[in-house]
A protein has these predicted regions:
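Catalytic cores of secreted or luminal carbohydrate-active enzymes
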Residues: 326-403
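Extracellular/luminal regions of secreted and cell-surface proteins that mediate adhesion/ECM remodeling
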Residues: 385-542
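Aromatic-lined substrate-binding rim segments of carbohydrate-active enzymes
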Residues: 97-154
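An active-site-proximal structural segment forming one wall of the substrate-binding cleft
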Residues: 130-142, 165-191, 216-227
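Active-site groove signature of glycoside hydrolases
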Residues: 149-158, 178-211
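Boundary/entry segment of secreted carbohydrate-active catalytic domains
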Residues: 38-105
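Bacterial N-terminal signal peptides
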Residues: 21-28
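Catalytic-core regions of glycoside hydrolase
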Residues: 191-198, 202, 206-360
Length: 542
C-alpha cells in the first residue's frame, strides 16, 4: 500500500491541482450564495470559505486533529506493568498516560510517543502477559482518541552507565514476535521509531555495543522495517542510519527521521543535524514525503540544571525553531520537553515562545505558510500571535477550504457537478489512511456516505521544487446524479475525512476538521461522524 501511494507522490507532486472523480451520488443544492444561471433551469452556485480569525470561537485554541501536532511522551515497563520513570506515582500501565492527557488537554494533543521498555525480557522471549500489557495500553490510547509514535527500548542509562542490555539475538527474536502484534494494532500506530538499541532506543551507549557495527545497525533497521506494517513508516534518529540501506529500495522510501535534540545552534550532541550540515539538508530534501517528528532537550538540561550539561544554559529560539520545523516538514513535536516541566527556577523555552510575538512579515520573509486572516480579528483589526501558537497550529497538515462550486439542475435524476478547492496551510502533507467522503445529512441526523477517489497524500502545502513555496490549490471534483429514491427535503452536505481503519472509522475524534472559521463542525449524536458542513441542500422530487 505504501509503495502505491509513494508512486502517486512521485508522479503528481508538481501538480497544483488534483482532480478526483466521484461516482454514484446525486444531489440538488440550495445556498444563499448564487452564481450565474445556466440554461434549462441549471444554475452555478459559488460558496467561498475563509480561514480562522483570532477572535473566532476557539480561534486562539489549537485545532484538534488526528496524527499531527504536539505530542506527549510515556514510557511503560512492560515486564513490571508500570511507568518507567515514576513507578511509585504510576504503579500501573496507563495511569501516567491518563494524567498527562489531562495536564496537556488544552494543547490539542492527538499523539503520544509511546516507549515500550522490554528490559525484563533480555535473554528470553516475550510472554503472553507482555502482549496483554501492551494491548491494555493501546486500548487506553483508543479510549483517549490518540495514536502512538511507537518505540521499543531496553536500556534507560547512557554514557556507560547501563548495567545490562539485550544481545542482537534478543532484539531479533523479539521483533519476530512483535510483527503480528503490530499488524493487529496498526490502526492506533501513527509511525514506528527505530529504537531497540542503547539508551532510550536512541542507538548509542548500548551495553553490548550494538551501535558500534554498521552491519548490526543495518541488520536491526532492516528487521524493524520488516516488523513494521508495510503501510507505516519507520523513523531513525539521524540520516546516517537511513543511509545504511539501499537508496533504491522500498525500505529506504519508508524510512523517515526523528530529531531528539532540536536546539538550533550546533552542538556535539545534535547528531550533525544543525542547519547547513549534510544531514540537515538531506532531511529538507526528503521530508516532503515523510513523517517527521522531533523534540527539544529537557528544560533542565538546556537551562543548565542537569549535571550532564556543564555548559551555560540557554533558551531554544522559538522563531528559528518554527523555521526549521517548516523547512523540514514536521508533523509532530514533543510538548513534554522544555515546556511544563516542574521544579525550575526559571521558565523553559516553550513558555518563552508564548511570550514571543510572530508576525506576518517574518513568515512572508521565510516563505512560511499562513492564512490571510490568521493575524486579524473578524472586524479586520490586527491580532497579535505568538510563536508557540503558530507552531502548534501549523505542525503537520492544516486544511483550509477555499471555495465550493455547484452546477446542475436541482431535480431527481438530473446531474450536478461539485468542485471543492482547498489549501494545506500546514508544514506537511497527510500520511496513513484517510478516505474522503461527501455526506448527506437529513433533518433527523441520518448520514448517507459517498466515497471519493481523493488521495490526501497529494495535499502538499507547496510544490517541493518551488523555491517560493507558493501554496498549492487542490481540488476535489465530482459529478453526481440525484438518486430517484432520495426523499425530497432539506439536507446538509458535508466533507467527512475519517480514519481509514475499520476500528476507528466511526469515531468523530479521529475525523479531520478543516481550518475554517465560518464552517459548522457537526458531530453525530452517536459520535460516529465528525463532518465539515459545506452547504444546505434542498432536494426536490422529479
Amino acid at each position: 500500500m505504501y509503495k502505491a501511494y509513494l508512486l502517486i507522490f512521485n508522479s503528481m507532486k508538481q501538480k497544483k491541482q488534483f482532480i478526483f472523480l466521484l461516482l454514484g451520488l446525486s444531489l440538488c443544492f440550495s445556498h444563499s450564495v448564487y452564481g450565474e444561471s445556466g440554461t434549462n433551469d441549471e444554475k452555478t452556485k459559488t460558496i467561498s470559505f475563509r480561514g480562522i480569525y483570532a477572535d473566532d470561537p476557539s480561534g486562539r485554541e489549537g485545532l484538534y486533529n488526528p496524527e499531527r501536532g504536539l505530542r506527549l511522551e510515556i514510557a511503560v515497563d512492560i515486564a513490571n506493568k508500570k511507568d518507567v520513570w515514576n513507578p511509585k506515582q504510576f504503579p500501573d500501565i496507563t495511569g501516567h498516560l491518563e494524567s498527562e492527557s489531562a495536564i496537556y488537554a488544552s494543547d490539542s494533543i492527538s499523539l503520544v510517543q509511546s516507549y515500550f521498555y522490554l528490559t525484563g525480557f533480555a535473554g528470553k522471549s516475550l510472554s503472553e502477559e507482555a502482549f496483554s500489557t501492551m494491548d491494555t495500553y493501546f486500548n487506553k490510547l483508543r479510549e483517549l482518541d490518540k495514536k502512538a509514535v511507537l518505540r521499543f527500548a531496553y536500556e534507560t542509562a547512557f554514557m556507560g552507565r547501563a548495567e545490562t542490555g539485550p544481545t542482537l539475538d534478543d532484539v531479533l527474536r523479539h521483533m519476530e514476535q512483535l510483527k503480528p502484534f503490530l499488524a493487529q494494532n496498526a490502526d492506533v500506530i501513527q509511525v514506528v521509531q527505530a529504537g531497540f538499541i542503547g539508551a532510550w532506543g536512541e542507538w548509542h551507549s548500548s551495553y553490548h555495543g550494538l551501535e558500534k557495527s554498521d552491519a548490526s545497525k543495518r541488520t536491526i533497521l532492516e528487521k524493524i522495517l520488516w516488523m513494521t506494517p508495510e503501510n507505516r513508516m519507520v523513523q531513525v534518529r539521524v540520516p546516517e542510519y537511513k543511509n545504511l540501506i539501499d537508496k533504491n529500495s522500498q525500505q529506504y522510501n519508508r524510512t523517515s527521521f526523528h530529531d531528539d535534540f532540536i536546539i538550533i545552534k550546533p552542538h556535539k550532541w545534535d547528531g550533525g543535524m544543525h542547519e547547513g550540515s549534510p544531514h540537515f539538508n538531506q532531511i529538507v530534501r526528503e521530508s516532503p514525503y515523510l513523517i517527521i517528528d522531533g523534540e527539544l532537550p529537557w528544560g533542565t538540561w538546556s537551562m543548565n540544571e542537569d549535571p550532564d550539561n556543564p555548559e551555560a544554559g540557554w533558551i531554544v529560539d522559538g522563531k528559528a525553531t518554527a523555521r526549521q520545523l517548516f523547512l523540514q516538514h514536521y508533523t509532530s513535536l514533543s510538548a513534554i520537553h522544555n515546556y511544563k516541566e516542574k521544579g525550575t527556577s526559571d521558565k523553559y523555552s516553550m513558555i518563552y515562545w508564548k511570550e514571543t510575538p510572530v508576525d506576518e512579515a517574518f513568515l512572508q520573509e521565510n516563505r512560511m505558510p499562513v492564512s490571510a486572516g490568521y493575524f486579524q480579528n473578524r472586524d479586520g483589526s490586527p491580532a497579535q500571535r505568538n510563536v508557540f501558537d503558530y507552531i502548534r497550529d501549523h505542525l503537520g497538515y492544516r486544511l483550509e477550504l477555499q471555495q465550493l462550486q455547484i452546477s446542475g439542475k436541482p431535480a431527481a435524476g438530473k446531474e450536478i457537478s461539485l468542485d471543492l478547492s482547498l489549501i494545506n496551510r500546514g508544514f506537511s502533507t497527510l500520511f496513513n489512511e484517510h478516505p474522503v467522503y461527501f455526506v448527506l445529512i437529513d433533518e433527523q441526523g441520518k448520514v448517507t456516505e459517498f466515497l471519493t477517489d481523493t488521495n490526501v497524500h497529494d495535499f502538499q502545502p507547496y510544490d517541493p521544487k518551488d523555491s517560493e513555496c507558493t501554496p498549492l490549490i487542490h481540488t476535489i471534483k465530482g459529478k453526481f446524479t440525484v438518486p430517484q429514491d432520495l426523499a425530497a427535503g432539506t439536507y446538509k452536505v458535508g466533507l467527512w475525512i475519517p480514519d481509514g481503519s475499520e476500528r476507528l472509522k466511526y469515531n468523530s475524534r479521529y475525523a479531520i476538521r478543516c481550518a475554517n472559521g465560518d464552517m459548522e463542525w457537526w458531530n453525530s449524536s452517536d459520535n460516529n461522524y465528525g463532518v465539515n458542513i459545506l452547504a444546505t441542500l434542498e432536494i426536490s422530487p422529479r
